[in-house]
Amino acid sequence: MAPGRAVAGLLLLAATGLGRPSEGPELAFTEDVLRVFGANQSLSAAQLGRLLERLGAAPQQGALELGQLHFNQCLSAEDIFSLHGFSNVTQITSSNFTAICPAILQQLNFHPCEDPQKHSVKPSFSEVWGYGFLSVTIINLASLLGLILTPLIKKSYFPKILTYFVGLAIGTLFSNAIFQLIPEAFGFNPKIDNYVEKAVAVFGGFYMLFFVERTLKMLLKTYGQNDHTHFRNDDFGSKEKAHQPKTLPLPPVNGVTCYANPAVTEPNGHIHFDTVSVVSLQDGKAESSSCTCLKGPKLSEIGTIAWMITLCDALHNFIDGLAIGASYTLSLLQGLSTSIAILCEEFPHELGDFVILLNAGMSTRQALLFNFLSACSCYVGLAFGILVGNNFAPNIIFALAGGMFLYISLADMFPEMNDMLREKVTGRQTDFTFFMIQNAGMLTGFTAILLITLYAGDIELQ
């Protein structure tokens, strides 16, 4: 039991002795309070002030003028003494301590000394829908990044950029789950339940093992030899390739034949964005382009994997929308934190989905269209999340989203972050560079969510 609640209970029991002889349990409880907070079985005005501070009922600023007493008037220790006819130098003993107990309990129950502006006020209807719609729109723009970033895939620096964003996604998703979503599911308050330090320890345990494991691998690994892997993948943008993978022909459309040079698909399902390009052949003349088949092949001729990815991504985005909507009904900072985590995760995932859809036989326009349509399911999830959050306790949604965030960060993106560099890393220096980039991404995401959690009560979104 919290110390403040224990003291409040003692005060209540002591107050029950009002008007009765000071004997029995009432006297024992009174003497306990006087022994802890007073001296020589008596209580001065200053010591009463410390008792009020311990109970969280002390005025934050100077004493207010006493007028007609009412339930929401903030009283200092001197005010309580004055109202009961005691001077500031009077020492309260057990015989008259019960007289001031009702005043202390009144201050403790109604908290009139708290700043009303500090109370957490739920966002208004327009704020929830406005900020929620804006956040989902920004997140959905990530689904269009494939078209913009496809030309950068073959750049030598692209693996470093992608590694940082994958690490950032891991840090934000994992931290948002342990700092925000899971505690909210259990009804914890970071200012009262003091779970933040324990959540930091949870992340610390994960990060410590990651750091030790990667360090040992760098120290013990013999570079320059072929690593034993269950798959092979080409280097990102490598110029030393002996030959390019064979292109896959797509059905002709309007007299134009498209050939998709697919991403390398490993047996374990990992996609490496190194050989994505589309060329067209018309009248026997080769022409490199992003894709001249704007209409694309028939939907029935597109690989099944494309529809599986689209449907799974739509469900994933629906859950994301649920989490965002429920978070914004709680507070704007909670919604912002969840949105940041989802945005960081969507960037590498949407890029990967775009490449998979191209590999399955879609044209660029079709891949963008279906990737964007699956992303729009986030709006549906947002609406459900807001409705549930406003009418019911959203704890179940927070628990569901927290578990999903843990799975995506630890079981999905974390192995992907390591596997994507298996053959890219050719020396200890290169391995160390990517290791530092991974650390920078994860620690950036962790720090951002931690700061939002710690200072959520001091940040105001107007």
From Swiss-Prot:
Keyword Ion transport included in the entry's annotation: yes
Signal peptide range in chain numbering: 1-19
Motif XEXPHE-motif: where in chain: 345-350
Gene Ontology BP terms: arginine metabolic process; bicarbonate transport; cadmium ion transmembrane transport; cartilage homeostasis; cellular detoxification of cadmium ion; cobalt ion transport; DNA-templated transcription; extracellular matrix organization
Topology feature Cytoplasmic, residues: 154-160, 213-367, 412-431
Extracellular side of membrane: 20-132, 182-191, 389-390, 453-462
Alphabetical UniProt keywords: Cell membrane, Glycoprotein, Ion transport, Lysosome, Membrane, Signal, Symport, Transmembrane, Transmembrane helix, Transport, Zinc, Zinc transport
GO cellular component: apical plasma membrane; basolateral plasma membrane; lysosomal membrane; organelle membrane; plasma membrane
GO molecular function, a single term: monoatomic cation:bicarbonate symporter activity
Cellular location(s): Cell membrane; Lysosome membrane; Apical cell membrane; Basolateral cell membrane
Entries under InterPro entries matching the protein: ZIP, ZIP_Transporter
PTM per Swiss-Prot/TrEMBL: N-glycosylated. N-glycosylation is not required for proper iron and zinc transport.
Pfam families linked: Zip
pH dependence, record text: Optimum pH is 7.5 for iron transport.
Upregulating conditions: Up-regulation upon iron or zinc loading increases expression at the plasma membrane (at protein level).
Record membrane topology: Multi-pass membrane protein
Residues bearing glycans: N40, N88, N96
Record's catalysed reaction(s): Zn(2+)(out) + 2 hydrogencarbonate(out) = Zn(2+)(in) + 2 hydrogencarbonate(in); selenite(out) + Zn(2+)(out) + hydrogencarbonate(out) = selenite(in) + Zn(2+)(in) + hydrogencarbonate(in); Mn(2+)(out) + 2 hydrogencarbonate(out) = Mn(2+)(in) + 2 hydrogencarbonate(in); Fe(2+)(out) + 2 hydrogencarbonate(out) = Fe(2+)(in) + 2 hydrogencarbonate(in)
Tagged with keyword Transmembrane: yes
Protein family membership: Belongs to the ZIP transporter (TC 2.A.5) family.
Subunit structure: Homodimer.
Protein name (database record): Metal cation symporter ZIP8
